[in-house]
C-alpha cells in the first residue's frame, strides 16, 4: 500500500519538478564517494540508492538507543530543503492552535481569513479534503508556474500570503474527498497566521522550532532572506536550480533544515515530547482514507510489507528530495535527503526496514 501511495505522489510531483529539466540536459552530477558519519549508514545509502541523478545524500536513523547519521558528500549539519515535509509542521501548528482554543479543527477557514466563498474547514485543509486543487488553476498563475519551472527558479516566489487566500477564494471547489493540495496547505498556514496575529515564519519559529531546539531550521519565505552561500540543488536531469523559499506558499514546502534538526523532530514525535505542545497522536493518528493510505493531520500512514505500518511524509522541490518515515511501534525513524529532485522515497523505506531489523 505504501509503495502505491508513494507512486501516486511521485507521479504528481514529477509533473511539476521535471518541467525544469525538459529543455536543457547537461551532464548529470554523480553520487559523491565522500562518506561521512556512520560508515554503515553511508554504505546503506550507496547500496540502496535508486536510479536518477544523484549528488549528495544524508540520512538520520533514530532508534530507542539514540541517533546515527551518515552521508555521501553531506552530513547532519548540511542545510537542505525538506519540501512538503513542511506540511507536517503546519499541521502541528493547527493542533497547537486548536488545543489553545484560538481555532477549532472544524472551523471554516473563512472564520479566520478572507477566503471569499471557500467553505473548507481547517481539518479538511490539513487532511487534503478541502476541495481545493493541487495548485491555483488561473491561467496567469499556471503560466507563471510553467515559466519558473523552465527557468529553474522558484515557481511560488511571486505569490504572497494575500495571493494564497485570493487563490482559495477564486478556486472552483471540488468534493470534500482526499485530493493532495499544495494550495490547501498554504491556505491552512496563512489562515493560522491570521488567527494568531503572526507571520507564518514567526509562528513556526515560536511554536515548533524553538521549543524543539531546531536551531538550524527556518522558513525564509523570500530569496532575500537567504545567505549568499545558501546551498542549492539539481533537477532530476542534473540541471542546477534555484532555491525554493515559496513566499506565501511557505506553509506547504518552504522549510530549510538539517538532518540533525529533523532527527530532533522525529524523536519528539516518537517519544511524545511535551515540547510539541500537544500529544503526538493528535497529528500522527489516522483520521481519513487517502488513496490507499490513511491520513492524520498532515501525516500519512500506510501498511508495511511486514504487516506493520509506516507513518510518513515525503517532499520534493526542484532541487531536493526528502523522506521522513517512522515505525511508531518500534520507535524507529529515518530521515533521508538528496540534493537532486530524484526521489529518495524507496531509499527511505529500505533504510527504515534495515533500522527496524537492527533495533
Segments and roles (model prediction):
Residues 104-118:
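Short, glycine/proline-biased beta-turn/loop segments that scaffold the active-site neighborhood
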Residues 70-78, 167-174:
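Glycine/charged-rich beta-loop-alpha catalytic/anionic-binding loops adjacent to active sites
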Residues 120-318:
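Short, surface-exposed loop or secondary-structure junction motifs
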Residues 59, 65, 80-106, 188-193, ...:
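Active-site SXXK
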Residues 54, 102-103, 198, 214:
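Helix N-cap/coil-helix junction residues
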Residues 1-70, 77, 81, 193, ...:
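Catalytic loop of the DD-peptidase/beta-lactamase superfamily, centered on the K-T-G motif
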Amino acid at each position: 500500500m505504501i509503495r502505491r501511495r508513494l507512486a501516486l505522489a511521485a507521479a504528481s510531483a514529477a509533473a511539476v519538478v521535471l518541467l525544469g529539466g525538459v529543455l536543457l540536459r547537461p551532464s548529470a552530477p554523480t553520487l559523491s564517494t565522500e562518506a561521512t558519519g556512520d560508515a554503515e549508514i553511508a554504505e546503506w545509502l550507496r547500496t540502496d540508492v535508486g536510479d536518477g541523478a544523484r549528488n549528495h545524500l544524508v540520512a538520520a536513523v533514530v532508534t530507542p538507543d539514540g541517533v546515527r547519521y551518515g552521508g555521501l558528500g553531506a552530513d547532519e549539519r548540511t542545510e537542505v530543503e525538506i519540501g512538503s515535509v513542511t506540511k507536517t509542521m503546519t499541521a502541528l501548528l493547527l493542533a497547537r492552535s486548536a488545543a489553545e482554543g484560538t481555532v477549532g479543527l472544524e472551523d471554516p477557514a473563512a472564520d479566520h481569513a478572507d477566503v471569499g466563498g471557500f467553505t473548507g474547514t481547517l481539518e479538511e485543509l490539513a487532511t487534503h479534503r478541502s476541495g481545493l486543487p493541487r495548485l491555483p488553476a488561473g491561467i496567469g498563475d499556471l503560466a507563471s508556474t510553467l515559466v519558473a519551472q523552465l527557468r529553474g527558479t522558484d515557481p511560488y516566489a511571486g505569490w504572497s500570503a494575500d495571493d494564497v487566500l485570493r487563490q482559495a477564494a477564486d478556486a472552483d471547489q471540488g468534493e470534500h474527498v482526499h485530493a493532495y493540495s499544495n494550495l490547501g496547505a498554504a491556505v491552512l498556514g496563512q489562515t493560522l497566521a491570521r488567527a494568531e496575529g503572526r507571520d507564518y515564519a514567526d509562528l513556526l519559529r515560536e511554536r515548533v522550532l524553538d521549543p524543539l531546539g531546531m536551531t538550524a531550521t527556518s522558513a525564509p519565505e523570500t530569496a532575500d532572506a537567504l545567505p549568499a552561500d545558501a546551498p542549492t540543488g539539481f533537477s532530476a536531469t542534473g540541471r542546477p536550480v534555484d532555491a525554493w523559499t515559496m513566499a506565501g506558499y511557505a506553509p506547504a514546502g518552504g522549510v530549510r533544515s538539517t538532518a540533525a534538526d529533523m532527527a530532533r523532530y522525529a524523536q519528539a514525535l516518537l517519544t511524545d515530547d511535551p515540547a510539541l505542545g500537544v500529544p503526538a497522536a493528535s497529528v500522527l493518528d489516522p483520521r481519513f482514507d487517502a488513496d490507499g493510505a490513511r491520513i492524520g493531520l498532515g501525516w500519512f500512514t500506510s501498511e508495511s510489507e511486514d504487516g506493520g505500518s509506516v507513518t510518513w511524509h515525503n517532499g520534493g522541490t526542484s532541487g531536493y528530495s526528502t523522506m521522513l518515515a517512522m515505525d511508531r511501534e518500534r520507535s524507529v525513524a529515518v530521515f533521508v535527503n538528496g540534493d537532486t529532485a530524484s526521489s529518495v522515497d524507496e531509499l527511505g523505506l529500505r533504510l527504515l526496514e534495515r533500522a527496524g531489523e537492527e533495533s
